[in-house]
A protein has these predicted regions:
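Bacterial N-terminal signal peptides that target proteins for export
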Residues: 5-15
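N-terminal secretory signal peptides
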Residues: 28-67
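Compact alpha-helical subdomains of small soluble proteins
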Residues: 61-139
Length: 139
């Protein structure tokens, strides 16, 4: 059972890296659906990583590395800040006891968290949030 957890997690981590790398140009274009999908996927994979003993620092390093190719330093910092909020939220959650004995339950919890984060993101206007933040920093 543990091998199944590790294989699924490895695949999700690889997918998250690819997703974040592909999302950088899309994020710059303020695409709501893609950005919210990234947030949901980050929440899901971060929770799985946490169950497997990955540190919050490890999770943030994934976010920071994903922004390396961004041309706009402001957007890069905003991306790190917003995604950092997702990582922080995951590390504030209570974890179920003995997740290795409840693989299906903790994977369902991670998927549920990802869906909730995605749905909440879709209710906000990402484009307006970024515009407001940019105006606040560059009057």
């Amino acid at each position: 059972m543990n091998e199944g957890i590790h294989m699924k997690t490895a695949m999700k981590c690889v997918w998250m890296g690819v997703l974040l790398a592909l999302a950088m140009p899309v994020f710059a274009d303020d695409t709501q659906t893609t950005y919210c999908k990234i947030q949901g996927q980050l929440a899901e994979t971060t929770l799985i990583g946490r169950y497997l003993g990955k540190s919050q620092t490890d999770a943030m390093q994934v976010v920071v590395r994903a922004t390396d190719g961004m041309d706009d330093a402001f957007e890069q910092n905003i991306f790190i800040m917003l995604m950092g909020e997702i990582v922080d939220g995951v590390y504030e959650r209570e974890l179920m006891a003995e997740p290795e004995q409840h693989e299906a339950e903790f994977l369902a919890e991670a998927r549920g968290l990802g869906k909730t984060v995605h749905d909440n993101c879709m209710q906000m206007d990402v484009k307006q949030v970024l515009k407001t933040m940019r105006e606040g920093y560059h009057p």
